[in-house]
Amino acid sequence: MNEEQLLKRKIIDTDNQAFNHNIYTYTNFLSINELSSVNKMSNELSFIPYDEWGGNPVCERKIIRFGSEELYGYDAGYPISTIRISPLSVKFAEQLNHRDYLGAIMNLGIERELVGDIIIKVPDAYVYCLSHIADYICDNLDSIKHTHIRCTICTDEIEAIKPELEEIRIIAASKRIDAVVASLTRLSRSNSNELFTSKKIFLNGICTENKSQNLKKDDVLVIRGHGKYIFIGDEAETRKGRSYLTLMQYK
């Protein structure tokens, strides 16, 4: 059984638990590619609704929750905690990167699927994780490389990592997704096409290699390594027949 088949089995089992026991059920954190695979499985799942959440709207790694308030009469939320990691002495702290933080956490014996996105806002970092391991991380993680740190579970919304939406306008050859991607990334059409073949383009949660489809209002476009956008629409044409397009970009 390959990894994709194993993932499908886990998803179907989690879906069936929600269906058979009338309770919310959750996956562990899934990568953006795994989430894409799940979003293609609608014909293999029960009628139980599901949604995704990673801690904030721009997270790539998310858990899936089966069930809804409409179905069960209550909202169980998501078992995700946010941990702030801060150096004990900012003056003597090293410049730590994503790999440093993730490596230190996994060295505690924690599996990757229990940890979501890590957002670095120097001098701090914020780690999304499943709630049942948050205390363990805080109790056991006291240094990263040569930097002594403290961990705190955040109970309120953190303004420092709250995403903002900014309206942007671009000029593209058309509303075709390849034209929009080329304009957003400032790459040539041929170079931007490599993003499709390397499976870095996601439209409404599904990895796509179809370069010819037109974007529609409220489509959510993710370009890995470049950003996340909501397509608003086209406004007018230039004298040369190119399109003015409006999108909202997560900052």
What is the meaning of each model-derived region?
Residues 171-217:
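A basic, amphipathic helix-loop patch mediating RNA/tRNA/ribosome contacts
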